[in-house]
């Protein structure tokens, strides 16, 4: 599995070796991981990263059910770290984020009941 930090950096358009903004990106990723924990996704005790070592597999037991987590984390980090200039794009991203939150929460609830 790919590193959480590395994959988010790639989606943000930053090269893997460019570490200038790693501290900022890590802080934003950890904020989003906290939200996911509150939604019931990921380890119940919470999860955070400090570098490019933790992978998506470390955060998620069953990555096939939660594949959208990667997109969700990217979109939330993008809006915080490098928001689009267009208000229409921001609105569209926020709608998608809301849908991801609803779907991820539903999947987490279904997984708990099984």
Feature locations, PLM:
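Conserved short "hinge" loops at termini or chain/domain junctions
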Residues: 1-65, 98-114
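Short, hydrophobic/amphipathic alpha-helical patches that form generic packing surfaces
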Residues: 71-82
């Amino acid at each position: 599995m790919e590193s959480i930090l590395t994959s988010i950096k790639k989606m943000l358009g930053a090269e893997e070796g460019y570490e200038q903004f790693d501290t900022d990106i890590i802080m934003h990723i950890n904020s989003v991981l906290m939200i996911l924990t509150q939604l019931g996704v990921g380890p119940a005790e919470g999860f955070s990263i400090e570098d490019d070592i933790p992978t998506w597999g470390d955060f998620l037991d069953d990555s096939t059910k939660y594949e959208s987590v990667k997109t969700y984390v990217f979109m939330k980090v993008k809006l915080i770290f490098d928001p689009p200039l267009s208000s229409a794009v921001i609105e569209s991203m926020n709608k998608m984020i809301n849908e991801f939150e609803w779907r991820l929460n539903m999947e987490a609830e279904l997984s708990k009941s099984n």
